[in-house]
C-alpha cells in the first residue's frame, strides 16, 4: 500500500527509483532463493510538482510486479527493499518492466481504480499507476514513472459524502503500460467514484484523485457530479505526471416545503431547473431527515427552477399531467433557502422564500376540516367559528380543497389566548349568511391548543356516523 505523505498541503506526482542488478544482490538474512530490489525516489518527484518539503514513501507490504512476478516492500520509508513474494517461473532476467500497483494479470497490466477513497493531502490507496523499465546493466537503479495524471480539489460545501468524476474518455480501469509510461486501455471506465475516508468531505482539506491521462490530441469533456447532478464541468486535457487543479467544488442546494394540500396522496417531488426552453434538467427531491423540507442539488448553469408535485406511481419527470400533478410559478433559484408553497393552492400560488432554519419549523396558519359522509349530504357548506378568547368571536368560511378536505386561513393574530376554542359548523346549502342562522350541525367547543401546541394538529375529522358531534372528532397533523 503506497501512501503519499505531506508536511504541508501539497500534491506530488511520483517518479520512483528502484535499484536492480543483472546479478541480484542477496541479503544474507533473506530466505534462500529470494531476490531483492532497493527502491527510492529521485529529485524529479519534487521538481516536477513543486512539492514543498513533502516526501513520497513506500509502506511496508506494498506490492509491485516485475516481469509479472510479485515483489513486496519489506519495510516502510523513502528507500526500501522489495523482495519477491513468489518464485519466478522459468528465466527471470533483464530486460525488466516493473509496474505499480501489482495485479495478477499480464505482466504489464495494472489497474487504476474506479472507486477511490481519498484523504487529506494524499491519493487513494493503489490509485497511482507507475512503471519502470531497465535493459540490464551494472547499475542497480530502476526509475519509476507515473502513468497517471492527478486532479487536485477542495469541497466548499459541508455534508457532501460522494463525488463522481465523469468524462467523454476513459478515466480509470485496467490498462496495459509500456516502458515509456504510455498505456492502452483493456477495460476502461469513464467514471470514478470519489469518497472521503471519514465519510464526509471536509471543507478545510485538499484532496487528490488519480486519473488516466488524455489519449490523443483532443481535449475531453469532464464533469464533477454529486447525487447524479453536474456541479462543475469543463473541456480539459489531463497530462501524465502533472496536476489539473479543479480548485473549489461548491455544491449548491435549494429547498422546498410543500403545503399540507400538496402532501395529499403521498406524492413525490421534483425540481425543474432551466436556463431557457432548450437548456434544462429535472432533479428528484428528497427529504432524508423527515423534517418536511425537500432538497435538490442545483445543476451548474441553471439559475431558474419550478418545483413540481409528481405522481408517486411513476418515476418519469416530464410535463405530462399523468406524471406532473401540480407546479409552482417560475422562480429564481435562491441558494440555501427554502420555498414554502402557499397553503390552500394547487398550481402557481405565490409562495414565499424562507431561510432553511425557519422553513424547518414553519407551520401553516390554516385549519382544515374533513367532514364525514353525513355532513357532506345535501350540498352542505362549512364554516369555522373562533370564540371564548380575548379577541371575541370570528366566523370563517371554509373552502373545498379537493372534495374531501376543506380549509381556511386563520387570522394573523390567532393563538390559544386570543381564541380559546374553535367550533366547526355544517351550514344550510340554501343559505349564505355566515352566522348561526345558517347552521345545520356543529361540533362542540374544541380547544385551540390542539393547533397551537405540539404536535401542531391542523386537520379535524368529524368521526363517522356523527351529526352534532360534540368532541367526537379526530385531530391529525396532516391531511389524511
Predicted feature residues:
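Sec-type signal peptide cleavage vicinity
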Residues: 2-8, 12, 16-278, 359-388, ...
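Insoluble glucan recognition modules
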Residues: 28-30, 37-39, 53, 171, ...
Amino acid at each position: 500500500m503506497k501512501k503519499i505523505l505531506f508536511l504541508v498541503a501539497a500534491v506530488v506526482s511520483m517518479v520512483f527509483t528502484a535499484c536492480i542488478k543483472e546479478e541480484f544482490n542477496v541479503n544474507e538474512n533473506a530466505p534462500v532463493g529470494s531476490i531483492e530490489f532497493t527502491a527510492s525516489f529521485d529529485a524529479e518527484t519534487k521538481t516536477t510538482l513543486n512539492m514543498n518539503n513533502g516526501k513520497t514513501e513506500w509502506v511496508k507490504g506494498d506490492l509491485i510486479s516485475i516481469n509479472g512476478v510479485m515483489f513486496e516492500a519489506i519495510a516502510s520509508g523513502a528507500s526500501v527493499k522489495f523482495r519477491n513474494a513468489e518464485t519466478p517461473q522459468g528465466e527471470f532476467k533483464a530486460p525488466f518492466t516493473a509496474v505499480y500497483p501489482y495485479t495478477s494479470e499480464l505482466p504489464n497490466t495494472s489497474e487504476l481504480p474506479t472507486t477511490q477513497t481519498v484523504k487529506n493531502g494524499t491519493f487513494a490507496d493503489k490509485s497511482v499507476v507507475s512503471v519502470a523499465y531497465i535493459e540490464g546493466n551494472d547499475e542497480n537503479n530502476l526509475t519509476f514513472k507515473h502513468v497517471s495524471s492527478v486532479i487536485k480539489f477542495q469541497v466548499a460545501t459541508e455534508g457532501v459524502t460522494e463525488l463522481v468524476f465523469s468524462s467523454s474518455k476513459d478515466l480509470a480501469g485496467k490498462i496495459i503500460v509500456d516502458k515509456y509510461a504510455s498505456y492502452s486501455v483493456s477495460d476502461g471506465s469513464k467514471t470514478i467514484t470519489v469518497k472521503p475516508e471519514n465519510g464526509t468531505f471536509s471543507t478545510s482539506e485538499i484532496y487528490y484523485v488519480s486519473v488516466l491521462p488524455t489519449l490523443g490530441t483532443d481535449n475531453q469533456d469532464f464533469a464533477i457530479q454529486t447525487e447524479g447532478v453536474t456541479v462543475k464541468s469543463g473541456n480539459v486535457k489531463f497530462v501524465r505526471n502533472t496536476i489539473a487543479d479543479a480548485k473549489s467544488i461548491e455544491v449548491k442546494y435549494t429547498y422546498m416545503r410543500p403545503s399540507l394540500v400538496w402532501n395529499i396522496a403521498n406524492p413525490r417531488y421534483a425540481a425543474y431547473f432551466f436556463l431557457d426552453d432548450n437548456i434544462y434538467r429535472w432533479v428528484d427531491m428528497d427529504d432524508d431527515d423527515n423534517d418536511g423540507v425537500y432538497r435538490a442539488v442545483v445543476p451548474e448553469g441553471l439559475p431558474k427552477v419550478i418545483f413540481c408535485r409528481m405522481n408517486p406511481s411513476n418515476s418519469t419527470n416530464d410535463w405530462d399531467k399523468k406524471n406532473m400533478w401540480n407546479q409552482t410559478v417560475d422562480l429564481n433559484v435562491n441558494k440555501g433557502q427554502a420555498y414554502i408553497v402557499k397553503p390552500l393552492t394547487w398550481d402557481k400560488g405565490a409562495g414565499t422564500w424562507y431561510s432553511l432554519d425557519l422553513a424547518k419549523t414553519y407551520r401553516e396558519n390554516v385549519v382544515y376540516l374533513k367532514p364525514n359522509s353525513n355532513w357532506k349530504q345535501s350540498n352542505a357548506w362549512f364554516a369555522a367559528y373562533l370564540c371564548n378568547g380575548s379577541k371575541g368571536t370570528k366566523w370563517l368560511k371554509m373552502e373545498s380543497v379537493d372534495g374531501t378536505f376543506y380549509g381556511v386561513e386563520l387570522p394573523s393574530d390567532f393563538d390559544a389566548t386570543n381564541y380559546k376554542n374553535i367550533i366547526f359548523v355544517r351550514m344550510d346549502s340554501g343559505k349564505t349568511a355566515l352566522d348561526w342562522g345558517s347552521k345545520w350541525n356543529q361540533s362542540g367547543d374544541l380547544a385551540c391548543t390542539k393547533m397551537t401546541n405540539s404536535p401542531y394538529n391542523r386537520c379535524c375529522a368529524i368521526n363517522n356516523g356523527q351529526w352534532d358531534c360534540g368532541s367526537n372528532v379526530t385531530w391529525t397533523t396532516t391531511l389524511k
